[in-house]
Amino acid sequence: MTITVPSIASRTASRIAIGLLFFSFCCFSQEKKAELCYTCHGKDGTSTTAMTPSLGGQPSFFVVAQLFLFRDGRRGKEPTPMDAVAKDLGNDDLRALGALFEKQPPPAPPLQGADAAKLARGRALVESRNCRVCHNPDYSGREQMPRLANQREDYLLKAMRDYRGNRRIGYGSATMPEELAGLGDADLADIAHYLAHYRKPK
């Protein structure tokens, strides 16, 4: 499986579309705001949108922290579509959305598409980097550390590339570049594949 990053043109088009969708976001109730989040992130907690993370089962603390950073324009070194989405969210909105997504069911492992060789390499890399120390032994996340298990593969790969390239700031930016140092794109792809297809041992 090859993961590709969208072109500048497609990213720009996505930002315009999101901007139009959320132009009156500040005027909506918390329930309506949550419904608009579902447009990209999935109503059942599982995203079916490319490069867009699933939020079901994410720790509330993590969701609130990320929305806070987006609202302040401090989530990345370049503007993101989420900056515009979050700019009119109040603190009560952040807490409500955090609680909502934490209660949603986490995404399930994909039913197909797993590559045994990539899974083995990814597992070895993840265990050698002690990812479980911060993200929990089952990669379910805790506090400000996100859930990694069964996250979208394309999103995991992009996030790791951004951390490795120091393009992502905020929580994690102090430790993740060091944790990913020395890993090539193929290594990151194997890690993303393993985590996306992770199954908790019985």
Predicted regions: what they are:
Residues 1-12:
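N-terminal secretory signal peptides that target proteins for export/translocation
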Residues 15-24:
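Bacterial N-terminal signal peptides
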Residues 28-44, 109-110, 114-137, 152:
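Sequence/structural segment immediately N-terminal to covalent heme-attachment motifs in c-type
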Residues 43, 81-82, 137, 172-176, ...:
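Residue-level hotspots at or immediately adjacent to binding/recognition sites across diverse folds
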Residues 45-74, 83-88, 123, 127, ...:
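Gly/Gly-Pro-rich "capping" loops immediately C-terminal to redox-active cysteine motifs
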Residues 77-85, 110-116, 172-179:
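Short, tandemly repeated low-complexity microdomains enriched for cysteine and small residues
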Residues 87-109, 154, 180-202:
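C-terminal capping alpha-helices of c-type cytochrome domains
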